[in-house]
Amino acid sequence: MCGILAVLGVVEVSLAKRSRIIELSRRLRHRGPDWSGLHCHEDCYLAHQRLAIIDPTSGDQPLYNEDKTVVVTVNGEIYNHEELKAKLKTHEFQTGSDCEVIAHLYEEYGEEFVDMLDGMFSFVLLDTRDKSFIAARDAIGICPLYMGWGLDGSVWFSSEMKALSDDCERFITFPPGHLYSSKTGGLRRWYNPPWFSETVPSTPYNALFLREMFEKAVIKRLMTDVPFGVLLSGGLDSSLVASVASRHLNETKVDRQWGNKLHTFCIGLKGSPDLKAAREVADYLSTVHHEFHFTVQEGIDALEEVIYHIETYDVTTIRASTPMFLMSRKIKSLGVKMVISGEGSDEIFGGYLYFHKAPNKKEFLEETCRKIKALHLYDCLRANKATSAWGVEARVPFLDKSFISVAMDIDPEWNMIKRDLGRIEKWVMRKAFDDDEHPYLPKHILYRQKEQFSDGVGYNWIDGLKSFTEQQVTDEMMNNAAQMFPYNTPVNKEAYYYRMIFERLFPQDSARETVPWGPSIACSTPAAIEWVEQWKASNDPSGRFISSHDSAATDHTAVSRRWPTAAARPANGTVNGKDVPVPIAV
């Protein structure tokens, strides 16, 4: 992952301003340690910190069209760049970068090209001919992007809020699937898939087609000019990613460059469930497996760094980010710069165990839609920033646009958990890859029940965090929590401890408003809490202690007050109930 910073329309154009923007851009250097770039045009600045994955020798940014009148700074990967280049026969490309195509697409089609991109991205593009600019973010929000406003009327964009929080009067999370245009002065949605309407589809389940689409999603993410691997926890999602990647490795140029042995990575406390399961999958797939251990104390020691990089105080996100943060450092030390991961499956297919209680297929579908729409606030945020903290890029095939469209078009009746029919969570994916003739995985792995990542690395991890924070936060501090933190008040000592660190690092009102909050049980949205009466009374941050599922489905997922309420969810030009100084046209 790269880091981008754009500042447009500043009042002061001086050497001091240029130096300040370079200084702020350096706050993103962990995301892109390979090279730094800056383009200045009058009162507009586009900065870039590069992590070189494609065309390491000539793909430095910012990137340009032929006459350098169009400038773009990009964080992301465009998987269909070769196909798009073929449509631009009259254009001359200067580099082998997959992202250069964005400048030429704008030149050819104007602002209406973003839905042509297949990939993960956030970018800012400046047209120097009239000083207009656009900014856009990928469909689901895999790549982070923040937008801010300076007192001088300047507009700011950054991959992480740490690069703009000190200089902007106000800033927000840039919404996924949106484009900002300076010509209209507002945001508009470019990604409008049928499932956004939450209308219940009736398409029958086609196991082979679903398998084919997922394999295509994994294969396109093997596009790389640097060493890579797969994050393997031993659960269904990461195991399927590893299996497909291993099976198709010899069809790509990766095989010729780095060999035909897939590298896999796992982290956990000694004796943790993930380590054992991942080792078994790695042995089955004959991967080059790397197993990392950490202690509870090492995780606790990293908490402040984790909160600084992830930019959240959400309890569940911090719990899961810490092992991933530690693992990414180890991965980078091996010379690996890109990994493929399994985020998104649970949201698409209702894989969290609380989905056992969905009363009907309509509510099941609506909950999956809500979960996908909020991924950029949780798992995408974690996966991207925990890896980017050490200059590693994470790719997520489950969040492929085409795959999501196919998966969300299946009649949700097929996703409902029905034990009398032998259907457990994510049954449609398990069945799609249940191939006796050419097995992808052993049966017991294919049908292994889900572990929350923060539990899978070792149950003592969460217990250790709770014990540690219990000692750091007094009862008196909790009694005054509402006075100290009137916005999103912490409901337990672990949440209070993380909030203290966050407020010290990011004291701005806008910063705390980027973190969603609200009632949640086992990672549910507030609406799903209505499914079970007992859930409404719980604020225990660990789903391990909630008897909300039948005995065959003991949930190890987390419980917290972590979801955006209606007042906290960006919509119709408001964020957390306050006006955003741009209109949003949906």
Curated annotation (Swiss-Prot):
EC code: 6.3.5.4
Active site: 2
Chain positions of site Important for beta-aspartyl-AMP intermediate formation: 343
Limits of the Glutamine amidotransferase type-2 domain: 2-185
Enzyme class, spelled out: ligase
Disulfide topology: none
GO biological process, one term: asparagine biosynthetic process
SUPFAM superfamilies: Adenine nucleotide alpha hydrolases-like, N-terminal nucleophile aminohydrolases (Ntn hydrolases)
Highest taxon listed in the record's lineage: Eukaryota
Family matches, as InterPro entries: Asn_synth_AEB (IPR006426), Asn_synthase (IPR001962), Asn_Synthetase (IPR050795), AsnB_N (IPR033738), GATase_2_dom (IPR017932), Ntn_hydrolases_N (IPR029055), Rossmann-like_a/b/a_fold (IPR014729)
Domain Asparagine synthetase residue range list: 193-516
Molecular-function annotations in GO: asparagine synthase (glutamine-hydrolyzing) activity; ATP binding
UniProt signal peptide: none
Residues binding L-glutamine: 50-54, 75-77, 98
Catalytic activity: L-aspartate + L-glutamine + ATP + H2O = L-asparagine + L-glutamate + AMP + diphosphate + H(+)
Function as written in the Swiss-Prot or TrEMBL entry: Essential for nitrogen assimilation, distribution and remobilization within the plant via the phloem.
NCBIfam families: PRK09431.1
Protein name in UniProt: Asparagine synthetase [glutamine-hydrolyzing]
Gene behind this protein: ASN1
